[in-house]
Amino acid sequence: MLTAEDKKLIQQIWGKLGGAEEEIGADALWRMFHSYPSTKTYFPHFDLSQGSDQIRGHGKKVVAALSNAIKNLDNLSQALSELSNLHAYNLRVDPVNFKFLSQCLQVSLATRLGKEYSPEVHSAVDKFMSAVASVLAEKYR
């Protein structure tokens, strides 16, 4: 459960990305594909090289979905409902992959933000990403 302080930290840190959202999303995906090679199976048509247009484009979509979730922290289920349906019913993505992406996104954020990615921010982002993963996996039950 996200506390009021967690929500505040998440919104603040997201606001500091300053137009680097696509870059962070692409970096997180690239890290995921290389740290967890099994995730590549969902993207057989993608050029999975670092910085490819396809990774950048999908990274932008991932970050846009997370931005929408951050705007709707009190109603994540509704904010992510369509995305949950897509991943569960159409794409049939194994829910463990949401955790993999979460870990890689946190590394990308920490790398980008340096000291601003404090232990408190890390904890808040980890809770947020766990909540997102949980909501995305709801339709699998």
Swiss-Prot record:
Tissue localization of expression: Red blood cells.
Domain Globin residue range list: 1-141
Alphabetical UniProt keywords: Heme, Iron, Metal-binding, Oxygen transport, Transport
GO cellular component: blood microparticle; haptoglobin-hemoglobin complex; hemoglobin complex
MF (Gene Ontology): haptoglobin binding; heme binding; iron ion binding; organic acid binding; oxygen binding; oxygen carrier activity; peroxidase activity
GO biological-process terms attached to the record: hydrogen peroxide catabolic process
Family of the protein in this entry: Belongs to the globin family.
PANTHER family membership: HEMOGLOBIN FAMILY MEMBER (PTHR11442), HEMOGLOBIN SUBUNIT ZETA (PTHR11442:SF41)
Protein name: Hemoglobin subunit alpha-D
Organism per entry: Passer montanus (Eurasian tree sparrow)
Organism phylogeny: Eukaryota, Metazoa, Chordata, Craniata, Vertebrata
